[in-house]
Amino acid sequence: MFQDAAFPDAKEQVRQSTDIVDLIGKHLELRRAGRGYVGRCPWHDDRKPSLQVNPDRQTWKCWVCDIGGDVFSFVMKREGCDFREALNMLADRAGI
């Protein structure tokens, strides 16, 4: 677990070490669509892919649920955890 003084640096280090396409692709089937990726949102009955992943911005968004964000918000939504727990999960995943 990160100390409060190291928290901002740890957050940025984890963000830079985690590719959003790789992270989301471990949980959802993504397919290339132009410069980004699309997949079926796990939070609603999604018949057509409405979740978009932008590798350039390192963000995701579901246009039906109107939710999205970065690697931290994806883990928080998927795991039902708070930011600090998501930070620690992603740090472990990145070997930080």
Task: Describe the residue ranges of each PLM region.
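N-terminal structured subdomain of primase-like DNA metabolism proteins
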Residues: 1-96
